[in-house]
Amino acid sequence: MGKAKSPRRVADNEALAVGTTIRGSAQKLNLVAELIRGKKAEEALNILAFSKKAMARDASKVLASAIANAENNHDLDVDALVVAEASVGKSITMKRFHTRGRGKSTRILKPFSKLRIVVREVEEA
């Protein structure tokens, strides 16, 4: 006896990948996510590979994972994949302190973000 299998969170022609602790603010990660929303998966990988943004490397890893999930787990055609969804949210925030003059200290906040990418198989027209 175990838990009942939970239903899929995405449709049958979709695959999902989530990056939960990407170092940097959600606002900066969203700039990278905007570059790939609605693009073909292969084109999106090329855009991220040549982007100057530091978070593009992490977003590229999540996108590659979504493509691999589509191919290996859901038997979808890799050439027909499109980035259907690229949503960004806040994750944890590491709190550090910085010592200042006269025995004082200030807070340093190091934010992390999460990225959820859904790729969908579309019919070639």
Swiss-Prot record:
UniProt keyword terms in alphabetical order: Ribonucleoprotein, Ribosomal protein, RNA-binding, rRNA-binding
NCBIfam families: rplV_bact
Protein name as it appears in the record: Large ribosomal subunit protein uL22
UniProt xrefs under HAMAP family: Ribosomal_uL22_B (MF_01331_B)
Function: This protein binds specifically to 23S rRNA; its binding is stimulated by other ribosomal proteins, e.g. L4, L17, and L20. It is important during the early stages of 50S assembly. It makes multiple contacts with different domains of the 23S rRNA in the assembled 50S subunit and ribosome.
A GO biological process held by the record: translation
InterPro entries per record: Ribosomal_uL22, Ribosomal_uL22_bac/chlpt-type, Ribosomal_uL22_bac/org-type, Ribosomal_uL22_sf
Family to which this protein belongs: Belongs to the universal ribosomal protein uL22 family.
Organism: Erythrobacter litoralis (strain HTCC2594)
Subunit structure: Part of the 50S ribosomal subunit.
